[in-house]
C-alpha cells in the first residue's frame, strides 16, 4: 500500500475497442493502444470484458496477457462465466464491478455489504490464482468496511458522482466524500484506488489526495487522443497526476 506521493496511472482501453466495434472492423486495435500507453508512462492497463461484449473481446484480453510489459487490471462482473475466464488468464489484478446490460457505463459501485457471502466467495476463489482482487465501490463507510470483511486487499472508489457534480458546492462535497473514503479505506488496511469519469479538468484534485495508490482513467484519454495521439494523451495525464500528487 502506497501512502507516498507516488501515484500510479492505470489506462483503460475499453473505448478504443468501442470505436472498433461500432463498425465491426479490425481497427483501431486496443492492443496497440495498450502498448502505446505503456510507452507513454502508463503503470498498468485496465480492460472490462462485459457480458454483452460491447467493446473488449476475449481475444483482446488473451493478446494483452501475452504482450503487456506492465500489468493487466481485469474488470469483470461476478458471474461464473467471468470467474472461469479469469482463472484461465490469471491476470495480475482483478476488479469486481457491478454490471447491467442497459447502462452506458458502470453507473455505481458494487453492493458488497448487501451480498457479503457471494463477494467473499468470489474474492477467495480469485485470490487462489494469484490475482490481487479489488472491489469497485462507492466512497461509503459501510461498503468499505464490508470490503475488508470479505477479504479484498484493495478497493477502487467510484469517482463518478464527483465527476458529474456541476456546482462548486456539489464538487466540494463529492471531493470530501472521496477524501473520507480514502481515509476510511486506509484505516481498514486496504489499498485504495479510484476512478470513473476523471478527465483533464477534474483529475488534479483527486490525484492530490494523500493515500491514493492508483487512478484508472479511460474515456477522457481516448477522446483527447483524437487531437494529440494516444501517447500524447497518456503522457499529459501522467504529468498532471504526478504534479498534483507532489503539490
UniProtKB/Swiss-Prot annotation:
Q: Does the keyword Transmembrane apply?
A: no
The record's catalysed reaction(s) read: 3-amino-2-oxopropyl phosphate + 1-deoxy-D-xylulose 5-phosphate = pyridoxine 5'-phosphate + phosphate + 2 H2O + H(+)
Query: SUPFAM superfamilies attached here?
Result: Pyridoxine 5'-phosphate synthase
Tell me one GO molecular function of this protein. Answer: pyridoxine 5'-phosphate synthase activity
The active site lies at 48 (proton acceptor), 75 (proton acceptor), 196 (proton donor)
Q: Which CDD domains match?
A: PNPsynthase
Binding of 3-amino-2-oxopropyl phosphate occurs at: 12, 23, 197, 218-219
An example Gene Ontology CC term for this record: cytosol
- What exactly does this protein do? Catalyzes the complicated ring closure reaction between the two acyclic compounds 1-deoxy-D-xylulose-5-phosphate (DXP) and 3-amino-2-oxopropyl phosphate (1-amino-acetone-3-phosphate or AAP) to form pyridoxine 5'-phosphate (PNP) and inorganic phosphate.
Q: What is the designated name of this protein?
A: Pyridoxine 5'-phosphate synthase
Species whose genome carries this gene: Pseudomonas fluorescens (strain SBW25)
Q: What is the lineage of its organism?
A: Bacteria, Pseudomonadati, Pseudomonadota, Gammaproteobacteria, Pseudomonadales
Task: Give the gene symbol.
Answer: pdxJ
Amino acid at each position: 500500500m502506497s501512502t507516498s506521493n507516488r501515484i500510479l496511472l492505470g489506462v483503460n482501453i475499453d473505448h478504443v475497442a468501442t470505436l472498433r466495434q461500432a463498425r465491426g472492423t479490425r481497427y483501431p486495435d486496443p492492443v496497440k493502444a495498450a502498448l502505446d500507453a505503456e510507452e507513454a508512462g502508463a503503470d498498468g492497463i485496465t480492460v472490462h470484458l462485459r457480458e454483452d461484449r460491447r467493446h473488449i473481446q476475449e481475444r483482446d484480453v488473451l493478446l494483452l496477457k501475452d504482450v503487456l510489459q506492465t500489468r493487466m487490471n481485469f474488470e469483470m462482473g461476478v458471474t461464473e462465466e467471468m470467474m472461469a475466464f479469469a482463472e484461465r488468464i490469471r491476470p495480475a489484478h482483478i476488479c469486481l464491478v457491478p454490471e447491467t446490460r442497459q447502462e452506458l457505463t458502470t453507473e455505481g459501485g458494487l453492493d458488497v455489504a448487501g451480498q457479503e457471502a457471494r463477494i467473499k466467495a468470489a474474492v477467495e476463489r480469485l485470490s487462489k490464482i494469484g490475482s490481487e482482487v479489488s472491489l469497485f465501490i462507492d466512497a461509503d463507510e459501510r461498503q468499505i468496511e464490508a470490503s475488508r470483511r470479505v477479504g479484498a486487499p484493495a478497493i477502487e472508489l467510484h469517482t463518478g458522482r464527483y465527476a458529474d457534480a456541476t456546482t462548486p458546492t456539489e464538487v466540494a462535497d463529492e471531493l470530501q466524500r472521496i477524501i473520507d473514503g480514502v481515509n476510511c479505506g486506509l484505516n481498514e488496511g486496504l489499498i485504495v484506488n479510484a476512478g470513473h469519469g476523471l478527465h483533464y479538468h477534474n483529475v488534479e484534485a483527486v490525484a492530490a489526495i494523500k493515500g491514493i495508490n492508483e487512478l484508472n482513467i479511460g474515456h477522457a484519454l481516448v477522446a483527447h487522443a483524437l487531437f494529440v495521439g494516444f501517447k500524447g494523451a497518456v503522457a499529459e495525464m501522467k504529468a498532471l497526476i504526478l504534479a498534483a500528487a507532489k503539490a
